Structure formats: C-alpha cells, structure tokens
Amino acid sequence: MSLKMKGKKYTDLDFVPTISDSEEDVPDLDSDEEKPKPETKGKKKNKSVDEESADMNSGFRFNTDDGEINTNFDGWEFLGDEKDEEKKDVDLDKIIRKKGGLIGMAHVDEAEKSESEESESDDEDLAMDGFGMGAQEQPEGEEEDEDASNSEQESNDEEEDDDEETYDVGDAGDAEEKVEEDTAEEMQAFYAPESESENAKKEVHKTFNDLALSRPVMKGLSNLGYVKPSPIQSATIPIALLGKDIIAGAVTGSGKTAAFMIPIIERLLYKPAKVASTRVIVLTPTRELAIQVADVGKKIGQFVSNLTFGLAVGGLNLRQQEQMLKTRPDIVIATPGRFIDHIRNSASFNVDSVEVLVIDEADRMLEDGFQDELNEIMSLLPSKRQTLLFSATMNSRIKQLISLSLKRPVRIMIDPPKQAATKLTQEFVRIRKRDHLKPSLLFNLIRKLDPNGQKRIVVFVARKDMAHKLRIILGLLGMAVAELHGSLTQEQRLDSVNKFKSLQVPVLICTDLASRGLDIPKIEVVINYDMPKSYEIYLHRVGRTARAGREGRSITFVGEASAERSIVKDAIRGVNDSEIPGSKAVGRNVDWNQVEETNKIVENMDQTVQDILVEEKEEKEILRAEMELKKGENLLKHKDEIQSRPKRTWFQSEKEKKNSKIMGALSKTKKEVNSKKRKRNEAMEDGHKRSYKKTQSDRTADQERTMKKQAKANGKKKGKSKGKR
C-alpha cells in the first residue's frame, strides 16, 4: 500500500491510530509544516538526509539527571489583546521625573556600595529557635567562625537587636481559631478509597517517558526542557488520564499547572476531528493567572494538530473574546465573572459538550467572594464531567466541596499541609512601634539586597493606595518600581508584569492579586511589607520565590498584633516539621540609625508626594473627559447599531448582589443572626415590605396622646361621682 493510501486511511478515523513496529511509512500527522514540493530522483537521497537533520538536532541528547526545568526557559508569556492603537494613560514616571526622581539610586555613594557587598554576610540573620545562619553552601566550620567574629564586633548595640529578634510567640496560639475538621466517616463516604491516593503517590516515574504519553505531547515537554515529572505530576497524571475526579495539593512552584494540562491535552488527541466544541473549562481566580495557564497549555500542546485555546477574562476586549469563542475552542481558560457573562450573552458559545472542569487555586475559588458565581457555573455545566481541583493550600472542608458535584474524588496531597517550599529562607524583622519607618526600611533593604538592580524583588502590601504611594516614594529616591493591583487597567497590569519579567523594573509592589499562581522565573526575594491576614496567604506570597527547586528568600515586617505573631509561629512550626533540609526561619538585623537617616529624607518629600498625586489625578480627569467625549460621539455616530444590540444580562440583580455581600460579611465575622433579624430577612425574601419602625418623636407623641386620654377618663370619673352625691 502506498504512503498516500495509508494517509487517506488514517484520516477517516476519529482517534489517533496505533503506530506499528515498522515506522518508516507512517506519515507525520502532527506536523504543522507544509509538505515540501516533490524533487527529482537525483536529489532524493539528499532530501531524506535534510529531513532527518531538520527533525533531529545532531547535538540533541536526552537529559536523565534530576533537573525538571531547563535553565534556558524564560518563563511564560503575559500577553493581552492585540490592539492597533494603544490606549492613552497617565505617565506617572514622567511626573516623578519632573519632580527630580528616577535619576539613579539616591544617596548611595561608592563606599556604601562596596560596604554593602563586602558586609552582606556580616549583616546575616540571627539564629532563631534553633535555626542556623549563613548560606547553605558554607561549611559548618566557616559558619561558626563567622558567628564568633560577628559576636565580637557587635557589642552593646547588637545586644539590643538580639532582644528584638528573639520572638516571643508562646501566647500567639491563643488567637488562632478552632477549625472544624472532617470526620473519618465523612471522608470515607466522600473521597475515593485511600489506597488509590497512596498507590498514586508511591508510584515513581523517573521520566515523562514512563507515563506513556503521546509523541506530540512529549515533543512539547522536551521543547520546554521538562524531563522528570515532579511528585504532583507523577501522582496525578495517571489518575487524570483514567477520567477520575481529583483534589490535589502541593507546595507552590511544584508544577501543578502542567499536572492538569498534560492529561487534558493527551485526552484531546482522541477528540472527534470534524466536530468543533469546547470540551475543557479551566477556572482561575485572577486574570493574570488565566493568561499564564493559557500560555502553559499552548506551549505544551504546540505540536498537537488542531488544538485550540480560548481566553475569557475580564479587562480585555469583550468583542474579540466573543469572536474567538464563536470558533468553539477546545480549551477555554476563564475567570468566573466573564465566563458567566459569555454563557448568558454570547449566542454562539455554549458549554453543553464540556467533559473536563479544572478549578485552579480551588481554596480561593471556594471562598465567599466566588461562591455565588461558582454555584451558577455548576448549574450550567453538564453533570457528567471530570472535575480537577488544584491548590497549594487545599484545606477546604467537604461541606464546601459538595456544591461542586464531585464523584468520589481521589485526594492527592503530596506535601504536608501549610508548609513553605524547600530551599526558602524566611526572615523576620520586628517593627515594634516603628510603623512610620517602614517605607525607609523597605528602601534600605532593597538597596542592600540589590544595589545594581539585577534581582527581581516582589513587595506585598495590604492596600492599593499604599502600593501606589510606595511607588512614588521609591521613584523619588531613584528606584525603578512597578505596581500591580486591582485599581489598574488590565493593560497596565500586564505591562507591569512584563516589565518586571524582563527586568526593566527590578521591583514589583503588589497586593494579594499577585500572590497566587504567578510563575515569573528567578524571583530572588519576596518582602511582606504588610503582614497577610492568614498563614495560607503568607504561604502563597512567599511561594513566588524558591520555585521548582531554586533557592529563595522572604523578608517579613512583623508588628505586635497577636495575629501577626501567630503567623510567625506557624512559619517556625512549618520549618521544624519539615523533614527536608534547606528551609530556614531566622530573624534579621536592621541598622535602625541608617533607617532613621533615610526617613528624614522621606519626610521632606511628603509635600512632593502630595503634589504628584494631585497632578496625576488632574491628568486622569482630563483623560476621562476625553474618553467620555469620544464615547458620546460614538453613541451619536453608531446610534442604530448600539440600540439594536441586546441588553446584557446577569444571573443576579443589584439587590441580590448586595444581600449576598451582607450575608458573606456576616459569615466571615461569624455573627449569628438573632431571631428578630432572621424573621425580617425571611419576610423580605417572601416579598413583604419592611414594617414601619417608630422614631423617638413618634414615641413621644404616643405618650402625650395616652396622657391626654387618661386625663379625660379621670375627669369623667370625677363628674359621675359628684352626681351620685
């Protein structure tokens, strides 16, 4: 049979055919390249040699060591819409430059630079609760000598610092809330037999070849430099390929995204070739994480023919997404709100043929903020589907998981719960009553850690306005900084991430928006400027560094609140409980005199900071006015077309949204609703109007009316008694 006839035979099949022992005549069905034109007989031999050299690099070799990711891999792409013209925005750096900032690292002379490089080991961490000091590569003898020399040089002043760095966290556990755990009977009834998860974790796959994956998927993994599956990938991929539901947890940076993308792409190799439909939905809590997951999938499946991806996230062009979803891509990565919007308002998009649902960062998605959206999505998706849940802190209770309609899921927890990554050094700086010095302390730390701007440093803050203010302060001090939070447009957010990734700006100040899932390679340091609300959020924050076996460092500013000390206690306990060496929890010395000197400069900048904020606000108002003017022109110009569009709908009314937020806030504070309020809420739900509540003036008027009635009654009684006499 000729090669042409064999190719025709395979195209009629709806699945990938098995390759026989003789592979010479099998066409490359997965290649996206065009077929070369036929050549003369004389060139046939040269042609085969050229094709062979093109398919296989002569210098290629299989890497069988323990490395998982190629060091040449530059990370995932964060690309948004492709627009013809860029949207106008306020250039904050230009305003800061006008005020004298962003010229260079301010107030740093050569002597200080050389001193910071030479004495970095002298300002190393104080041992805390039995943890060693110094870098991991130093021999033990050198550590002891360095410790001795440091203790001789740092006399009375350092004794005070020693007291500061000794954390008294003995009473911090009192503030911890008691969390109800699932009973053994509940777990046995809900989850698959424990033997399945234990067998999955015990089975070790040294390479991806042991997982019996198809050649297009293997080619994509090889192109990314993936050789050895991580423990979470080794355990979950075989179970996912069997079509079973999974609840999986592993430390940050362990390859969870690839753990669900690889089996999904492998399954889609066997999809019907002639029927276009959306078969996989991946839900993420943030837009940046969705864009990253889409890029992971595209790069793993780049050699799989006819595999399509769609992105449905907020902040990007709605019409472009609608046009893309019309093609019914195989895999749609979405955020919950925009996903529901497209299901309800995009006529050509439906989810009737969805076979796999993935919820990334599942514990965050199960919180109150996403609960209503998640319930709506579950009601729209087919009940017969495979559901995969992944998170670094997967501690959700069965009561929360019931709403996801899981069918005896296999529970795979690779690492102990609530544990940071290995090779992470966790440092703590006790602030005491010096909160006003935190901006100056942050500047001094960054200057000491990275005087030349060649390291990637992420700074986490609690509030958006603080992130913006810190960007201005550090910019005035000559430091290039980007910010990432919810007040920025999606284009600004992606621009900040890309500039940080390419080291155009070495410092990224962000809220917890960036604490989950984002995998930017070679983040050396994470600084917690504000303490997170919980230890779980802390783990996600520090998980931005020390990823995939690399070393990393986190520095946390700790106040006097019991909740903050409790997080420090949990971090120390996590390191103590860790059986793998490499992670440390230590205190860090700070030269507070130098911080005070920097703070004098920062205080003198207060008026300049306010002037910059005012100028930025004015420019934003001008741009907003221009945008409104352009919007009005478009409404007049395209009036008929705009009015003919159907009105977009949502599954909740404004009143229902408000009630949902109130109930969510009550559940967070754990306040029980008393019987009076409960009856009133029930009456409102039944459609009855709220009864009128008397005011103080109403009660006073009632009292006066009652007194008049009593006076009249008393007068009548007296008149009757006189008549009888």
UniProtKB/Swiss-Prot annotation:
Q: What does UniProt give as GO cellular component?
A: cytosol; nucleolus; preribosome, large subunit precursor
The chain positions of domain Helicase C-terminal read 423-613
Annotated Helicase ATP-binding domain ranges read 237-412
Please name the GO terms of the biological process aspect recorded for this protein, alphabetically: ribosomal large subunit assembly; rRNA processing
List the biased-composition ranges (Basic residues): 708-725
One of the entry's Gene Ontology molecular-function terms is: RNA binding
Q: Give the domain note.
A: The Q motif is unique to and characteristic of the DEAD box family of RNA helicases and controls ATP binding and hydrolysis.
Q: What is this protein called?
A: ATP-dependent RNA helicase DRS1
- Its source organism is Candida glabrata (strain ATCC 2001 / BCRC 20586 / JCM 3761 / NBRC 0622 / NRRL Y-65 / CBS 138) (Yeast)
